[in-house]
Amino acid sequence: MAAVVLAATRLLRGSGSWGCSRLRFGPPAYRRFSSGGAYPNIPLSSPLPGVPKPVFATVDGQEKFETKVTTLDNGLRVASQNKFGQFCTVGILINSGSRYEAKYLSGIAHFLEKLAFSSTARFDSKDEILLTLEKHGGICDCQTSRDTTMYAVSADSKGLDTVVGLLADVVLQPRLTDEEVEMTRMTVQFELEDLNLRPDPEPLLTEMIHEAAYRENTVGLHRFCPTENIAKINREVLHSYLRNYYTPDRMVLAGVGVEHEHLVDCARKYLLGIQPAWGSAEAVDIDRSVAQYTGGIAKRERDMSNVSLGPTPIPELTHIMVGLESCSFLEEDFIPFAVLNMMMGGGGSFSAGGPGKGMFSRLYLNVLNRHHWMYNATSYHHSYEDTGLLCIHASADPRQVREMVEIITKEFILMSGTVDAVELERAKTQLTSMLMMNLESRPVIFEDVGRQVLATRSRKLPHELCTLIRNVKPEDVKRVASKMLRGKPAVAALGDLTDLPTYEHIQTALSSKDGRLPRTYRLFR
């Protein structure tokens, strides 16, 4: 019995007490976990002895990280901005996308995005490309939008030569084998199915609002490949498109965290005088169409009652997006529109990203706070080189669709009304804060540099944009809103649309003084 008690006591005291059989009583003895030495006696405000001195970025302004741009003999632009750190982000941005597919099968840009970083003339497979990048701690990505295709790599700056050579090979020398194209067909098919089944309808609504606003032209063409075109797109079709739009004069090699001269040398080495895989380096037939805003409505009836992420069902909702033409990002009114969009703000009835963001924006104060049955009210601003679209997305129970649409049309009318000085300053401060916070990220700086140089051949620095934001006055916001309201609306509707007002009624509400929908009379209910 004594042996059992002794064993139990040892277990309670831990493995360190197996060498001692005598129980201790009284105050507990505290053990020092420090190994001794001088370090525990050094205050946190003093550096540890023998440790290399860290190198920090300076803020004295002696080194100005300005964007430098060089144009090569073939028309390709090289843009760079140095940045503190040992890693860089480098990529090729191309003036191509779904808006240029009017003379081609819709969906080519979608295919090219999924085929990116596959086998090339130098690399036999995607695995070989990834292995090469891993030697420099690198990752790669390709994204396409309606007007831009972007191939990007983030890696150690010491591997810049390898990275630029790899990017040149991926963009100009893709093999596009039958096996890769077939695999891409399955990937695109899966993505389309996922797009139609996901609970978040925002990507689909964005596609629909562009379709309604720009009927079958430029940015109104399908961003995603239509199902009927999946089997039709092959290597010959892709080469026909690449021959016209993957030309040096439509490209920008952008880099952040690199020396400009080194990047230019790499561009001359790998992107000058290179024969692309499709043969000719000169474009034959380029679509230079200007976006034509038409307005209209795009509707899609769908049963949203069974949409769920898990065992807990999501409430059945009808989603509406109403938009009006704004302006291109090349116009002076782009900044007032950006401030107006931030002033409208909005969001969902629940945000997992932390409470408080935008809670004093108009769509929160006037819509979500006053109408508990609305699940979402968010403002979006899409801007391109020749047009723009400011829209509001709202969602609610299908039985309250008419009331929801009227609330949104009223908010559009109020945009051209009185602008409170406090809310304007808050919106400008939020916009400036968001701009500067996003530009702390190296990949975001890369995209900003590349897109601006691609569109304007130069770049406005952040402090210039902040000055433009600060100079926006209440009358500027009122002016651009009044101008916007003179156009025809674009409407996208998804879900149970039984009680959806007609397009003519929505247009009438946006032309009125109070934003109210015309009254409807029913003989039978």
UniProtKB/Swiss-Prot annotation:
It is found in: Mitochondrion matrix; Mitochondrion inner membrane. Coiled coil: none annotated. One of its GO terms (molecular function) is metalloendopeptidase activity. Residues 1-33 form a transit peptide. The modification N6-acetyllysine is found at residue 299. Transmembrane segments: none annotated. Its main location: mitochondrion. SUPFAM superfamilies: LuxS/MPP-like metallohydrolase (SSF63411). The modification N6-succinyllysine is found at residue 64. GO terms for biological process: protein processing involved in protein targeting to mitochondrion. Keywords: Acetylation, Membrane, Mitochondrion, Mitochondrion inner membrane, Transit peptide. Belongs to the peptidase M16 family. Substrate recognition and binding subunit of the essential mitochondrial processing protease (MPP), which cleaves the mitochondrial sequence off newly imported precursors proteins. Heterodimer of PMPCA (alpha) and PMPCB (beta) subunits, forming the mitochondrial processing protease (MPP) in which PMPCA is involved in substrate recognition and binding and PMPCB is the catalytic subunit. This is Mitochondrial-processing peptidase subunit alpha. The gene is PMPCA.
